[in-house]
Structures are given as C-alpha cells and as structure tokens.
C-alpha cells in the first residue's frame, strides 16, 4: 500500500439557476458549456493529505443570467512515509482524482436530473493526460 483514501466528502456545492430564463437557456445550450477542474492539496499531519477536487460546469460565455454549478469534493489520504515526492505528486494529481471522479460525476448528474434535465452526463476525465499536458 502506497496510500489509502481514508475519507471523501462534499466540502462545498453550488447549483444555482437564477430563474426561468437561465433554466431554458441552459436546457437549450447545454452543449455550449465546459467543465473545468482544479486539484489542490495540503498536508494536514504527518502522512495525511487533504486533496480538494474542484469541478466547475460553466457556459463558455459569461452572462449575468447564467447558472453557476460547482462542487468541491475533498479526499483525505494516508500515505507511506518513504514515498518519493514525484510519486506523491502523481497520487495527488492523477490517482485520487481518477478514483473519486465517478462519485463527483454521479452527484452532479443527480442534481441535473432532479432539476429537470434528463440524461445529463459529465464527460469522462483523463487525469493522466491532464497531468502530462500541464507538465509540458
């Protein structure tokens, strides 16, 4: 065992549709939106790191009538003392986000479904590819 996810939870959640106009614009133009993801971490104790995965679903063009959807999903991991920094970086930026993304996806999809949007599904994310792109 190099690391173990000991806890995961929703730290913050925002699903705001300002009104009927926003609702119908979103329904009509849902394909004209993008998903942004930001992963940050901080060491809490020896061998324990909190990893925050922030997901934003937003329109490509900003407008005062636009909705705001974001989820901050936190994971606590316990890792071995002898782990190298490079390996720990990959755990934080690739492995943990990959492991928790199905939960985030399910939560966001359920919010959309319960808000009247049928068959909404977030795209798959390749955190390995995102990591490699950011490194170059």
Roles of regions detected by a PLM:
Residues 1-136:
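N-terminal intrinsically disordered, cationic/polar leader segments
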């Amino acid at each position: 065992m190099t690391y173990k996810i000991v806890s995961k939870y929703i730290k913050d959640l925002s699903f705001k549709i300002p009104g009927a106009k926003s609702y119908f614009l979103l329904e009509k133009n849902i394909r004209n939106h993008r998903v942004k993801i930001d992963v940050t971490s901080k060491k809490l104790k020896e061998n324990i790191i909190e990893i925050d995965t922030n997901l934003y679903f937003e329109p490509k063009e900003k407008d005062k009538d636009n909705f705001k959807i974001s989820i901050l999903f936190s994971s606590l991991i316990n890792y071995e003392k002898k782990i190298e920094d490079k390996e720990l970086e990959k755990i934080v930026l690739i492995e943990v986000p990959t492991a928790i993304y199905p939960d985030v996806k399910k939560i966001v999809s359920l919010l959309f479904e319960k808000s009247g949007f049928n068959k909404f599904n977030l795209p798959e994310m390749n955190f390995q590819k995102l990591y490699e792109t950011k490194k170059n």
